[in-house]
Amino acid sequence: CLQILKKGQKSMARNDGIDRTLARNQDLETPDDVTKVQEHNEREKDRYSNVDIVPERTALNVHFKSPTDDYVKMFEQMEQDKIISTRGLKPDAVKYGELVFDVNSAYFYNHGGYEFAKQFYADAYKAAVEIVGGEQYILSAVMHADERNRGNVGSSGVRMCTTITSCGLYPGGGETNPVVEAMQG
């Protein structure tokens, strides 16, 4: 859950007493992109270029849905089992998506800390399952509690976010992510 600010964009953690949430839908265009996201989300690397990951805190991460295999193989199995179909899609259609919910740490620490964060993201996960039409369309959902939040002065500096990685194909057709549509709705 690395927050990369665009030029002129302010950090969520501004220490101004206002709680902020960032929901970002990221298209994953190639299987290589999916593999990189999996390595990050599932903490499969021995070393990270992201210096904000604190390996000693990785045990605090919470899976709301653990992957049963690597993400690309899971997607392929879903196709074989006819849970999803890619028939008729344009060759350049995006098949995978990642939805990141990021909330400034102070919000959690002011409302009950780690346990509150776990419940918050459990509820977000339940909503995502309902919106996409079932848990079978979600490959993995994990709350990261092992990343520093350098911009959050006055808190413990731990950033908590959850990432929901899904196949980009949902019941009823279409290539848009209904989670994001519902949030924007």
Tell me the role of every PLM-derived stretch:
Residues 1-185:
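N-terminal nicking endonuclease/strand-transfer module with a His-rich metal-binding environment
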